[in-house]
Amino acid sequence: MADIKEGVEEGSVKVDMIKEPLTQGDTGVDEVDFAKITLDDAFKYLNCNKHGLSSAEAAARLQQHGPNKLPDSSRNPVLVFLGYMWNPLAWAMEAAAIISIALLDVADFVLIVGLLLINAIISFYEESNADKAIKALTAALAPKAMVVRDGAIVTIDAVNLVPGDVILIRLGNIVPADVKLLEEEGADEGEQEAPMQIDQAALTGESLPAKKFTGDVAFSGSSIKQGERHAVVYATGVNTFFGRAAALISGTNNVSNLQTVMNKMSAICIVTILLWVVVELAVQFGHYSHECVGGREGCPTLLNMLVVLVGGIPIAMPTVLSVTLALGAYKLAREGAIVTRMSAVEEMAGMDVLCSDKTGTLTLNKLSIDKSMVVPVGNMGVDEIMRMGALSANTVTEEPIDMVLWESYPDRETIKRDYKHTKYFPFNPNDKITIATCLEIATGRVFRVLKGSPQVVLAKAWNAAELDATVNQKMVEFANRGFRALGLAMADGDGKDGTKWEMLALLPLFDPPRHDTKETIEHCQNQGIQVKMITGDHLLIGKETAKMLGMGTEMFPSEVMIKARNGDASQLHGYKNFVEMVETCNGFAQVFPEHKFEIVKILQDSNHVVGMTGDGVNDAPALKKADVGVAVADATDAARGAADIVLTEPGLSTIVTAVIGARKIFQRMTTYSKYTIAMTFRICFTFGLITVIYDWYFPTILIVIMAVFNDGAMIALSKDRVVASKTPNSWNITNIFIMGMVYGLYLTLSTWALYQTATKTTFFEDKTPLHSLNDQYSVLQPWCEDEVRAKLGQTIDPYASLCESNSYAKQFDECEGYQKGSGVQVEDVPTLHAQCVTEQRYLRGAMTRSLIYTQVSISGQALVFVVRTAGYSLMERAGTSTYLAFFFAQVGATLFGIFGLGGFEKPRHQLEDCQFCDYSFHEPVDWFDSGIVPESGTESDFTASVIGCGGYVIVAWIWSAIWYVLLDPIKWILFWILNEEGFRDTMSWRESTKRSLDRRSKDDIGDKEFTGPSGMVPANYSNPLGRASMSKPVSAVLDRKSASLVAINRNSMTVSQDPNRALNIGRRSMIGRPSGPVGRTSMPLGRISRTSNTLSTGSKDGQIGRGSKPLNSSSAEIKPDKYDFASTIRE
């Protein structure tokens, strides 16, 4: 590699000579400090010049040096797959598998391992597909770079940059590679150089932007805060300063909020399971004196413990939640909202305040200039003014204002032919102007054209005092009509010998509101989101736009905000304090980026989840600070880098769609969370209680099969059709735990009642044609006496030795030489009656297990339909995938319940060809061909076997349906007590049910219908404006925002100014739709109350109803404001 000659003095910025240029495969990063060598030496070292590379040279270098990106952080797919089996829940399942194989229970071991593998395969497949799809959609967000190729500036993907490329970097760009700045374009020798300001805090820790001049270096990843300059690339990819730093921290790993939530829920489940495991073992080994001598034959108690351990573990939880999030993020990306931080989906679901910029989000950002409204303030005519405007534009950057000025001048070709830009001073947020230095080719005349904020342009004019009144008056007129004002000035010369600026004109820029913004804002408010306009434009422009959009006009300029923050009570405008003012008002105008940051912080301190939109480099701090930073379409690289969500489609509607999508994702995740907690409690308490009280066994194989059917089907929840919550969402583990516990205990009660009814009563035998499953001795004693006589003859003594049976006598050595009919008892040989009781208990218990299995499976998965909605579950249509999952899972469970396992597992102390295992009506048992039964007296090491319960599956379905009916009322009671989703604050359960009935015929994404006033929450006596503010509205606001209500009856009409009385008239008629702090400006004319025969009217532009007189004498015209009239030309 090339070496630098020795002899360079320490601190020198010049290299005497470079032995050889950069060669193939080299970058020179480690050999040369580019900050200390001259530009000429850098060009020699990189083997290039200021005119950049040709396409062929760039392609060759790309092959040699590789792409300008860090190495892919993708992990080995095998390790990713295995990772799905490495978490606390999987560890518990793996422990169960180890116990199974240690006890030589191969079948359970295989099924448990199979369940783990199925879960991992589904997770790997679904998440991989979602990740690939998201990467494909985010390819459009790949950083771009403006590079000089073949002598022309072209835009390419930054990944294709190579050492030696000359690029153009400007305000808002993220520096795409390590570069060395070239001299300013068009700069003359001796002219003072304007520095670039580059924010490299993320790389170097500098708190303030660094000033950079010609020859200085800028690192990849830093952002341009001011200026525009060409630069030569000297390092790309891993060889950049950022690349080497990233390599050092690549091992760090942050725990997401979802992972934290899963850890908490996993802990709840595991603690519950372990408690029951301890109780079961203590009772069975203690009270029931079970023994454990090792091996499968000698320790059935441990196998029974696996039922609680395997059944209670929500093994599918990481899969369902992560896949739900991944698939949801993919769907958001398809709808124009690309998630850069996955946990932002959860925060977007909880967002209750959205601070939106005006330009491009609430408006179209398609500027136009009405030439008839141009205001000349000098000696030029309108055509000449428009020509100067076109000359001031830099069309390379394609900024909206530059483009509208350029395109508004019809004779653009003459400008290209007759003039040349020799220098361009770009816009920056501090100066608020641009300056173009122009050369008239024919005459050699040099002049400069300045455009920008009217106040700034006016201040530079030589006759500013004379023009001040005219300019301010016209600015107010423009603002009253919703126009932004742009100042234009010119001066002869290039500025070296002083400048005499002459202001030429004020140009009106109109940016029309989006056609769907008004409806979208209404929808936002109906979804519990307060929209605040945060604009850099003049206050009057903001208010006029707000009126067009139906927003509230309670807006203030940043000057008022600053004074109020500093304790000036006169600027509070009736609010109690500054915090309430920020929280309650509809927006702020004439704001700077630091104001946005402060607004976000104040709202967050008031317990709001705040979303902030932005597009510029100076919006980055506020975007980073916000809970949900949203970079709008066509945002700068810096804004995109700071945002959590990047929009690819313009407009507020995309944000609302993303919020609704995020809430749906959240709804799916909380649905599964409630379900899985409920199932843990249900399995633990159901089988734990029956085992502890009755020393009852349940085969592990059944619980594993149930987990395969039901937990596998839960993946469908990630694609379920849900209705987004009307209120912001957040994880409330306490509520999830309480609701899951109540559901689980209720389902436990349903199974317990079924077990008691089937095994301790004769209800089913008496009321249905089904045989009895009653296992009580009082029932079995007479039945077995009849059964023994029916099988062996009426003269046989039922209590005689088992040796009386030819079949069984062959299986006992003790029966050798036994004389039938002697009635002699044989030691160690059970009696006929005792064997009959044992066989019947074995048979009925085995069939009861199939019944319980089927009922637990059906009622458990049916719970999903209850917890997925706040309304009536039978009327809220679920997704097709959810129905199909339930159908196939329960068809499998039903078939399994009918046919069972034919007596598997076989009893350890067994007799073949059972003699007394008929149904209770003395018919042979179906699906029990083996006839293997346990020997009487071996119950202490009894193996839990399974035989199909046949027609009892109908009982399981009917029983589950009956108990299902009460789940919705229980849910509503819990919603009321816990105020889930604002249930208690916003509606009664009857209203919730009615609303769910209304919704089921609608498309699930829209819910366009208003369900309350236009404010955040429905009005009530303590909150008559329906505000979502944490603080009570001040009296001044109530007085200012109250509207009259006209109550009409046949004989009289009364007008009420009392908000409380308004509430008595009718819920929907309250204050019309108030133009309150968070409401719309007014209500549509003559809206009829739904709850009473009243007509509610609201003011719109100062008018009431059709043709009626105003309530007050205030005019709809906006008066000139006392505040500073400086308006910015971009937000």
UniProtKB/Swiss-Prot annotation:
Stated family: Belongs to the cation transport ATPase (P-type) (TC 3.A.3) family. Type IIIA subfamily.
GO cellular component: plasma membrane
Start-end of Basic and acidic residues biased regions: 994-1010, 1118-1131
Catalytic activity: ATP + H2O + H(+)(in) = ADP + phosphate + 2 H(+)(out)
NCBIfam families in UniProt: ATPase-IIIA_H (TIGR01647), ATPase_P-type (TIGR01494)
Annotated keywords: ATP-binding, Cell membrane, Hydrogen ion transport, Ion transport, Magnesium, Membrane, Metal-binding, Nucleotide-binding, Phosphoprotein, Translocase, Transmembrane, Transmembrane helix, Transport
Presence of the UniProt keyword Transmembrane in the record: yes
GO terms of biological process kind: proton export across plasma membrane
Chain segments carrying region Disordered: 994-1023, 1067-1131
The protein, known as: Plasma membrane ATPase
Residue stretches spanning the membrane: 77-97, 98-118, 151-171, 231-251, 265-285, 305-325, 642-662, 689-709, 733-753, 884-904, 946-966
A GO MF term: ATP hydrolysis activity
